Regions:
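Rossmann-like NAD(P)(H) cofactor-binding subdomain of soluble oxidoreductases
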Residues: 55-131
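Interdomain hinge/lid region at the active-site interface
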Residues: 221-278
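Short beta->alpha hinge that forms the Motif I/post-I loop of the SAM-binding pocket
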Residues: 37-38, 71, 171
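NAD(P)-dependent dehydrogenase/reductase Rossmann-like domain
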Residues: 272-290
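Internal alpha-helical scaffold of NAD(P)-dependent oxidoreductase catalytic cores
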Residues: 30, 44-45, 131-225, 279
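NAD(P)+-binding Rossmann beta1-loop-alpha1 motif at the extreme N-terminus of oxidoreductases
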Residues: 1-62
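Hydrophobic Val/Ile/Leu positions in short beta-strands of Rossmann-like dinucleotide-binding domains
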Residues: 9-10, 69, 143
């Protein structure tokens, strides 16, 4: 592992910025400066990292070798441009954004001034600041860089803070982010739908979650052990047309749930075909029903 000697500035003291700052500190790397538009979040993070709160993104960036931007996506390019248009020289500095969907183009203002630019995105979900730092270790980071030297630096950086690297082409970052959204955010939406069905039959939300969480955990465990094809169970995996019809009939007065059920089940047919255990006629019957 190469030695990382750079000092860091973090612009954005939310969940991701705080987690990264803690990870840097635990790795023995120096957080030199910090900025956030939210003064309360800025003060809390500044106290946590033992640094003075900067007055602006440019003020934070001028004293560091590497600038990590962890703002909301629509602010990344604005922050980068503000720093790039400031009076001090940024040539040779490293600009990193941690957005999943944005490409290197969001950092073009800095690249035009001679800075190196990187996308380093943690494939992880951060529900709150308290657990965010712990979740970074062992996570995979989607990295994108414009040259081999920057790619090597990104890999080394990720390894230093306890993560693993997955190289993503710049033009593929939106699709890459879609995959992460489906895996994490869609899971929450699906479970919300499942809980809402329980509530319709009089089961309280807490009781519904108590019943469903073990099922969800075992399903994820099955995916890890057997893969996304072998892990599928239930009526669609069995070719149980009668049960699927009964489900759809029961959702006749619930158009949104019925649309969701059909859409997800249609994708499940792809799994059934790939699995190759059902007769084609059985899959065709389910396809017509859906």
């Amino acid at each position: 592992m190469m030695v990382i000697e750079e000092t860091f500035a973090i612009v954005g003291a939310g969940k991701v910025g705080t987690a990264v700052g803690i990870a840097l500190k635990e790795a023995g790397l120096r957080v030199q400066a910090l900025y956030d538009i939210d003064h309360r979040a800025l003060r809390e993070a500044a106290d946590l990292f033992g640094v003075e709160a900067s007055r602006s993104p440019a003020d934070a960036a001028k004293s560091a070798d590497a600038i990590i931007i962890t703002t909301p996506d629509d602010m990344v390019e604005k922050v980068c441009e503000e720093v790039a248009l400031s009076k001090f020289d940024i040539a040779g500095k490293i600009f990193i954004h941690m957005s999943g969907a944005l490409t290197l183009e969001a950092l073009l203002p800095a690249a035009r001034k001679g800075a190196k630019t990187l996308c380093i995105h943690p494939i992880q979900t951060f529900a709150d600041k308290k657990t965010a730092a712990r979740m970074l270790k062992g996570s995979v980071f989607g990295i994108t860089a414009s040259d081999e030297s920057s790619t090597n630096w990104a890999r080394n950086f990720v390894e230093k803070i306890g993560g693993k690297s997955l190289q993503i082409r710049n033009e593929d970052r939106v699709l890459y982010h879609i995959a992460a959204v489906i895996a994490s955010n869609f899971l929450v939406m699906i479970e919300h739908a499942a809980v809402s069905v329980f509530e319709k039959i009089g089961v309280k939300r807490d009781d519904a979650l108590e019943a469903l969480i073990p099922l969800v955990r075992q399903t994820v465990d099955n995916i890890q052990r057997f893969g996304v094809v072998r892990a599928l169970t239930g009526p669609l995996a069995r070719g149980d047309v009668g049960t699927i019809k009964a489900h759809l009939d029961s959702l006749e007065n619930e158009p949104e749930l019925k649309t969701l059920y059909r859409a997800v089940s249609k994708w499940g047919l792809n799994i059934a075909r790939e699995r190759g255990e059902l007769e084609i006629t059985s899959i065709d019957k389910m396809a017509r029903l859906l």
